[in-house]
Amino acid sequence: MSEKSQCVIVGIAGASASGKSLIASTIYNELRAKVGDHQIGVITEDCYYNDQSHLSMEERVKTNYDHPNALDHDLLCEHLEKLMKGESVEVPEYSYTEHTRTENTTTMTPKKVIILEGILLLTDPRLRDLMHATVFMDTPLDICLLRRVKRDVEERGRTMESVLKQYQKTVRPMFMQFIEPSKQYADIIVPRGGKNRIAIDVLKAHIAKLLKA
């Protein structure tokens, strides 16, 4: 994106449990000292899953959460555009146990740097146009699956059986249909997950360059 704005938006995409959150938090923590604690923020695409409060729990669990239609990219684009104009937004809060948004929101004030992370970011041309730099976490799917099982069982109240069933039914097929093809839109492709030190340093240097532009 070439248009001058009040903030730099960096998008980090890739498979579920590929290391997106880890690399986003690492860059966030390491850049705070340079740009200021209140001048960098992270937005997770998961927060923009559709509000399903009108559906029963039985209907909610049937949703294909790995398909672009499960996400409210209209609202995400609207919020990013407002932040770029120097306006604050109310980021939704999503509950993984209730499979819908909660009544709570988090106020996001304008920042110099916004790190956006999510599985389907690069599939939407509107989002790609708003990003100043794009990253794809190219982590092997077997590694992602192991991480996903551990995370969803320990942190999201899931059973191993339900995680594996979802992986076979939607996660892997949607990765092959939507996420993997979106890799072509990445400026930087990161192998070996979120602990890739060289990739982190390259990203930080690129963000610093964008801030000076």
Swiss-Prot record:
Q: In which pathway does it act?
A: Pyrimidine metabolism; CTP biosynthesis via salvage pathway; CTP from cytidine: step 1/3; Pyrimidine metabolism; UMP biosynthesis via salvage pathway; UMP from uridine: step 1/1
Q: Which InterPro entries does this entry report, sorted A to Z?
A: P-loop_NTPase (IPR027417), PRK/URK (IPR006083), Uridine_kinase (IPR026008), Uridine_kinase-like (IPR000764)
Q: What is its EC number?
A: 2.7.1.48
Q: Coiled-coil ranges per the record?
A: none
Origin, by domain of life?
Bacteria
For this UniProt record, the keywords arranged alphabetically read as follows: ATP-binding, Cytoplasm, Kinase, Nucleotide-binding, Transferase
Give any GO molecular function from the UniProt entry.
cytidine kinase activity
Q: Where in the cell is it found?
A: Cytoplasm
The record's SUPFAM superfamilies line, in alphabetical order, gives:
P-loop containing nucleoside triphosphate hydrolases
Q: Where does ATP bind?
A: 14-21
| Gene Ontology annotations of biological process type | CTP salvage; UMP salvage
Under the cellular component aspect of Gene Ontology, which terms does the record hold? Answer: cytoplasm
Is the keyword Kinase in the record? yes
Catalytic activity, reaction form: uridine + ATP = UMP + ADP + H(+); cytidine + ATP = CMP + ADP + H(+)
**PANTHER family linked to this entry:** URIDINE KINASE (PTHR10285)
Assigned protein family: Belongs to the uridine kinase family.
What is the name of the protein in this document? Uridine kinase
* Provenance organism: Vibrio vulnificus (strain YJ016)
